[in-house]
């Protein structure tokens, strides 16, 4: 018989508690809490059918979704953007999207997503852009959407939404763009605060007055036609004669039209056949897809003018739709007789295809025939920074700062991480594109000259845009990385002012040279006079001042005094700006150093007349007289005047 004492029992109970505590602690430590954003995104993915694997790298065991495709995160690693347009997604949109409370943009347009729009979207207080257009959503528009107090851009067009017109949308305070066209909504349309809204294609809606025609039905009385026999045979004969004559004319017109159409089609087929033979030396370029001219002709509707996205110095860019539904941008190069030969063109294509960075426009394909050169890029649904600066709603300050940093990182990659390095030579707002999540993407670098490590510059014909061209490039045709840095500085001024460089120059034409005037306002701490009025008071004054300082550093007259793009990125991110700004004051050219009377009097009459002639020179108008003053180069004023006279 076993006798259990009190002491033994206490020891056993203590051991039991210790064992249970150890098991609980082990379970707690071994099961790391899951990120609620990961759970929400996985639920969204599981509700969708993804035929092209666009969401394949969404890992349910991951704790950080910021590296996933189609996801944009804030600097604090919070999910702020979900963008998967034109991915052929189907299925339903999970209500778990309401758990992504930091979302600012949702872009799921041009898919086949069906079912009801989840009311949980109303739980996203920071949402600014919601685009569910061109899907198969049905049912009512959830009333909870009126709770999106930050919403500015709403597109639900081209779905199968029904029910009464959502009058509650008029209560969203900041809504500036609304498109509900081509659905099955009914009832009266209230007044909206949105600057732009579209309700076309909803057959059962009507204006708010008068209400009696808003029942959603159309009453039509039958059409009655009476024929009187009293008109006699003469009227019948006349009618028959007119009918025969009219029919003959119609048949003749149709015959002529058919003949012209046939001739035009044969001519087009002949052109297609002539252009459809790929150059033998340009076939099979790595990962680049080779298109035939006939394919691109079909994808762009015959290079229709309605599909033109933009026109530049290298040619037109057309919107295209591939056979699988993917949207692309097709650049059709002009003046190909002046382009390099097959070997040089092949080398440039290969180098461009290796320049892969999230802030660079990726080349995905090409077409090269004896008469055509075409490049195929991904379609950027939000256009260019230049167009967004002119559209409504205006880009907010945080977005402008994000664009500046993204563009700077793209140029840094071209300058310091490509081998051989690539010079863009036309950095401007029109060449900075915005993807579905408003991430800055540098475009048109694919047509830049490649810079060999053995060279410090490339001498060639001047290419670029007036107002963005660096002075040394304009005067000598010599470009370098610092040429791009100058253009980037002008881009920063465009982001600050909301104006193109030429528009900005006209604005300040009565106040002196553009950059000289900017520096003066900065010295006098009147930065607000430069700011885009569309920003209102929604900006950080310190950040604006810092960006302006970076712009002024980038646009210094001498290339050697401008920072490298790696330094520009650090300064925009808040590192090293103060030191660089202080060091810049050691350059006598940076601020006003007016030409002394002694210097001018020592010039010959010819030299003075040369200097006077530059009052109308573009470089003089940009830099002012301070551009002529520099002790570092020890060059006479005459040589500077010669440099500023433009390309020879």
From Swiss-Prot:
**Does Repeat count among this protein's keywords?**
yes
Residues at which ATP binds = 309-317, 331
Catalytic activity as recorded in UniProt: L-seryl-[protein] + ATP = O-phospho-L-seryl-[protein] + ADP + H(+); L-threonyl-[protein] + ATP = O-phospho-L-threonyl-[protein] + ADP + H(+)
Q: Where is the protein situated, by its record's location annotation?
A: Cell membrane
Q: Which residues carry this modification: Phosphotyrosine?
A: 473
Chief subcellular location = membrane
Provide this UniProt record's keywords sorted from A to Z: ATP-binding, Cell membrane, Glycoprotein, Kinase, Leucine-rich repeat, Membrane, Nucleotide-binding, Phosphoprotein, Receptor, Repeat, Serine/threonine-protein kinase, Signal, Transferase, Transmembrane, Transmembrane helix
Provide the positions where the record notes the PTM Phosphothreonine.
300, 326, 459-460, 465, 476, 555
Task: Map the LRR repeats onto residue numbers.
Answer: 100-125, 127-148, 149-172, 174-199
State the membrane topology: Single-pass type I membrane protein
Q: Which residues are glycosylated?
A: 99, 112, 158, 184
Please give one Pfam family short name.
LRRNT_2
The terms describing its cellular component in GO are: plasma membrane
Q: Which residues carry this modification: Phosphoserine?
A: 384, 387, 475, 480
PANTHER family per the record?
A: SOMATIC EMBRYOGENESIS RECEPTOR KINASE 1 (PTHR47988)
**Protein's UniProt name:** Probable LRR receptor-like serine/threonine-protein kinase At4g30520
Q: Which organism is it from?
A: Arabidopsis thaliana (Mouse-ear cress)
List the taxonomic lineage.
Answer: Eukaryota, Viridiplantae, Streptophyta, Embryophyta, Tracheophyta
């Amino acid at each position: 018989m076993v006798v259990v004492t009190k002491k033994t029992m206490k020891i056993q109970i203590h051991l039991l508690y210790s064992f249970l505590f150890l098991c609980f602690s082990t379970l707690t430590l071994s099961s790391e809490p899951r990120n609620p954003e990961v759970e929400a995104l996985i639920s969204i993915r599981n509700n969708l059918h993804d035929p092209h694997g666009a969401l394949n790298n969404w890992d349910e065991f991951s704790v950080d979704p910021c590296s996933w495709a189609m996801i944009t995160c804030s600097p604090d690693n919070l999910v702020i953007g979900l963008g998967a347009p034109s991915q052929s997604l189907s299925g339903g949109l999970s209500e778990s999207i309401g758990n992504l409370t930091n979302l600012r943009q949702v872009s799921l347009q041009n898919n086949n997503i069906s079912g009801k729009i989840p009311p949980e979207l109303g739980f996203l207080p920071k949402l600014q852009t919601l685009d569910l257009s061109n899907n198969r959503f049905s049912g009512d528009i959830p009333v909870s959407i009126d709770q999106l107090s930050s919403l500015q851009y709403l597109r639900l067009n081209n779905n199968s939404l029904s029910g009464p017109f959502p009058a509650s949308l008029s209560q969203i305070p900041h809504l500036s763009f609304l498109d509900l066209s081509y659905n099955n909504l009914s009832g009266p349309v209230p007044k909206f605060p949105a600057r732009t809204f579209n309700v076309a294609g909803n057959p059962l809606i009507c204006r708010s007055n008068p209400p009696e025609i808003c029942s959603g039905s159309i009453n039509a009385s039958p059409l009655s036609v009476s024929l009187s026999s009293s008109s006699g045979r003469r009227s019948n004969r006349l009618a028959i004669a007119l009918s025969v004559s009219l029919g003959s004319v119609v048949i003749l017109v149709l015959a002529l039209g058919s003949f012209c159409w046939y001739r035009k089609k044969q001519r087009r087929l002949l052109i297609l056949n002539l252009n459809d033979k790929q150059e033998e030396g340009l076939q099979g370029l790595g990962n680049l897809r080779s298109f035939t001219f006939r394919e691109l002709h079909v994808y762009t509707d015959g290079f229709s003018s309605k599909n033109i996205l933009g026109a530049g110095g290298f040619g037109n860019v057309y919107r295209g739709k591939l056979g699988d539904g993917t949207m692309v941008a097709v650049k059709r190069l002009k003046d190909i007789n002046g382009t390099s030969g097959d070997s040089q063109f092949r080398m440039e294509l290969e180098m461009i295809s290796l320049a892969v960075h999230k802030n660079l426009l990726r080349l995905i394909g090409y077409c090269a025939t004896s008469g055509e050169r075409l490049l195929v890029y991904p379609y950027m649904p939000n256009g260019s920074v230049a167009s967004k600066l002119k559209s409504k709603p205006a880009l907010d300050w945080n977005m402008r700062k994000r664009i500046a940093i993204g563009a700077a990182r793209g140029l840094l990659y071209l300058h310091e991480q490509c081998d051989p390095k690539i010079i863009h030579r036309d950095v401007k707002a029109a060449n900075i594109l915005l993807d579905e999540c408003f991430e800055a993407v540098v475009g048109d670098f694919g047509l830049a000259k490649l810079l060999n490590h053995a060279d410090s510059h490339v001498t060639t014909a001047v290419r670029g845009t007036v107002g963005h061209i660096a002075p040394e490039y304009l005067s000598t045709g010599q470009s370098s990385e610092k040429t791009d840095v100058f253009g980037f500085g002008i881009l920063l001024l465009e982001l600050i002012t909301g104006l193109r460089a030429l528009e900005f120059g006209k604005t300040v034409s009565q106040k002196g040279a553009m950059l000289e005037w900017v520096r003066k306002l900065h010295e006098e701490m009147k930065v607000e006079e430069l700011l885009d009025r569309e920003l209102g008071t929604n900006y950080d004054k310190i950040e604006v001042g810092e960006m302006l300082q970076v712009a002024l550093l980038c646009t210094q007259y001498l290339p050697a005094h401008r920072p490298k793009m790696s330094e520009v990125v650090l300064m925009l991110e808040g590192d090293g700006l103060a030191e660089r700004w202080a060091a810049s004051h050691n350059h006598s050219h940076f601020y006003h150093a007016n030409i002394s009377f002694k210097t001018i009097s020592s010039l010959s009459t010819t030299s003075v007349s040369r200097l006077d002639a530059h009052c109308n020179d573009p470089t003089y108008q940009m830099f002012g007289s301070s551009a002529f003053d520099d002790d570092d180069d020890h060059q006479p004023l005459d040589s500077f005047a010669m440099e500023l006279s433009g390309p020879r």
